[in-house]
Amino acid sequence: MLKWFIISCCLLTAISYSTYYLFTSNSWIKTVKTHTYSRFYQLIKENTKTQLDRLQEEAKLSGKSLIPPFINFDREYAIAPKYNISICRIKKSMSTLMSGVACVLYDTGKFMRNNRSILEVWSHRFCGEKNEYRRMNEVKWRMGDAHHTFKKIVVIRDPIARFISFFSNKCIFEAQKYPDRKQCYNCQGNVTCFLEKQYERFVQHSSDYSRIRPSYEDKHAAPLSWNCEFGKFLKDYKIIKLAVDPKDRKNGLANLMNVLKESNVPNSTLRFIEKSALEGETMHATYDSDAHDVVKKEIENDKKIREWLKRIYYLDFVIFDFDTTFINS
Ligand SMILES: *[C@@H]1O[C@H](CO)[C@@H](O)[C@H](O)[C@H]1NC(C)=O
Ligand SMILES: *[C@@H]1O[C@H](CO)[C@@H](O)[C@H](O)[C@H]1NC(C)=O
Ligand SMILES: *[C@@H]1O[C@H](CO)[C@@H](O)[C@H](O)[C@H]1NC(C)=O
Ligand SMILES: *[C@@H]1O[C@H](CO)[C@@H](O)[C@H](O)[C@H]1NC(C)=O
């Protein structure tokens, strides 16, 4: 009788211990769950989200709220189903070259027979609407059999370098050429004036009740994370980063070439793309470079301008892992 009593006691203790252990320490549950990839990515995303939220809280406390990330604002896709590729273009981020690349890959033979150039001005480009879509769902549908496996490519560049290029081109060069358009909110090349107005517009666009229509300036200056449906698809993208220094552009180009090579694009086509891209580089180098240098100097010398830039682009730096030394200075 005593023997049975002792055995029962031991069993009960064992059972309650293990139950207690299971319910209080759920670390084993976590381990199991992370083995499914979607959960794993979800966790990474939650970490990133927590990090972004924390940065936003800090910024708010100092009275300088950041523009929120991942607003679904602008999308431009061009596809090359033959190579299972879709390219998302971000304005002022080699977008002309990238639409040229998508066009060559879409129908290489026709492109070559017509003696077209990869760097044709956007409005005259050869493929036009033939391979271009505005929503990822449509891109998926057009990819046919590859709708689960196609590669999403995007080229991004340092947000400040992109802003300088945008501002010197659209707010100085074009604004002077077409004064009637009052482009860039009629700021006459004043960077601070532009950023104050643009910041307010981005705040409005990121509210759920936004009534304003996206302007030409909004689309060119929008944070990187507002493009390409990154809120949903960031982890699926092959991200090609351009170096800040145009002299290092060749590296960015080499990355692009590698990604295309992985997609079985033939050598001759790769060489054609590379040659055109480098020619375009020298073409651009001389074009509005004076304004470019002036804007760059202004940003370097004016902390207030850097603060505005930080409010708009800081989370881009974090999300896409760019060097924050300058923007924090
Ligand atoms: C192709 O275009 C280039 C310049 O754009 C021109 O020099 C060349 O003669 C053209 N070739 C043909 C075959 O049309
Ligand atoms: C594109 O994807 C389809 C379906 O997944 C596959 O059969 C085909 O081989 C792929 N083509 C290339 C060039 O990778
Ligand atoms: C530029 O704009 C800012 C803000 O609108 C203004 O305070 C400043 O005086 C302007 N600078 C010049 C040189 O006009
Ligand atoms: C393409 O170039 C690579 C090296 O750059 C070479 O190994 C490969 O054989 C070439 N392919 C063809 C089809 O010429």
Swiss-Prot record:
It catalyses: chondroitin beta-D-glucuronate + n 3'-phosphoadenylyl sulfate = chondroitin 4'-sulfate + n adenosine 3',5'-bisphosphate + n H(+). Disruption phenotype: The tm576 deletion mutant is lethal. The ok625 deletion mutant has reduced levels of 4-O-sulfated disaccharides, but increased levels of 6-O-sulfated disaccharides. Increased mortality in response to oxidative stress. Highly expressed in the head and tail of hermaphrodites, in particular in amphid and phasmid sheath cells. The keyword Transmembrane applies. GO terms for molecular function: chondroitin 4-sulfotransferase activity. Its EC number is 2.8.2.5. It is found in: Golgi apparatus membrane. One of its GO terms (biological process) is chondroitin sulfate proteoglycan biosynthetic process. The keyword Transport does not apply. GO terms for cellular component: Golgi membrane. Residues 24-329 are lumenal. The chain crosses the membrane at residues 4-23. Residues 1-3 are cytoplasmic. Belongs to the sulfotransferase 2 family. This is Carbohydrate sulfotransferase chst-1.
